[in-house]
Amino acid sequence: MNLIDIMQTDFRKDVLEYSRSKTKGRMQSDSVITFTIPSQAREIICRWMDKRTGKLDFGYKFTYHNFSQYVTYSLGDLAEELNIDERVTFYSARKSFAQYASEIGIPDGIIDYCLGHSDKSKGVIRYYTKVRQKQADMAISRVIDYVNNPEKYKEYIEQRSDIMMMRG
């Protein structure tokens, strides 16, 4: 999710439904992304969620633009503290999710759905099929498992690489 979508979301329910602010109004119909909030994220959300509104409240009472700059600056500090040499941005999480999901063989259409991308421009079959919440939930769960247990997926990733590159 983009930061603006996170800040506008009511997190009181276990199932999250939202339309990306970035694409709202650009399509004939705003696509709604639906998935179950993973327990790992729920713990963090509960720490920062205003119980009355369901929105996250970090105690920062300035404009969204200023808050966005503050988050970007803070991510830079965090990366430095963790000895990460690359530039870390809020968008890095979206890119990492997509990369990890692809590495473990999650279909592009499901990755697109989880990221809130339109799936109508990528072939005829996508006009006839629809990603379901359960598929998104499974993909998110599998990516979390991969991040926490990369060795578990090592053999699969190597086999997949061999197949994709037609190595024998």
Question: What is the meaning of each model-derived region?
Answer:
Residues 37, 41, 67, 71, ...:
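Hydrophobic (often cysteine-bearing) scaffold residues that line and stabilize catalytic clefts
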Residues 77, 81, 92-117:
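C-terminal catalytic core of tyrosine-transesterase DNA break-rejoin enzymes
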Residues 65-69, 77, 81-82, 108, ...:
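Acidic, low-complexity interaction regions
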Residues 21-34, 59-67, 85-89, 130-131:
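Short, contiguous acidic/charged loop-to-helix segments that flank catalytic cores in large enzymes
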Residues 36-85:
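Active-site/catalytic core of tyrosine-dependent DNA strand-transfer enzymes
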Residues 1-46:
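Conserved tyrosine-mediated DNA breakage-rejoining catalytic core shared by Y-recombinases
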Residues 7, 46, 76, 99, ...:
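Generic hydrophobic alpha-helical scaffold/packing signal
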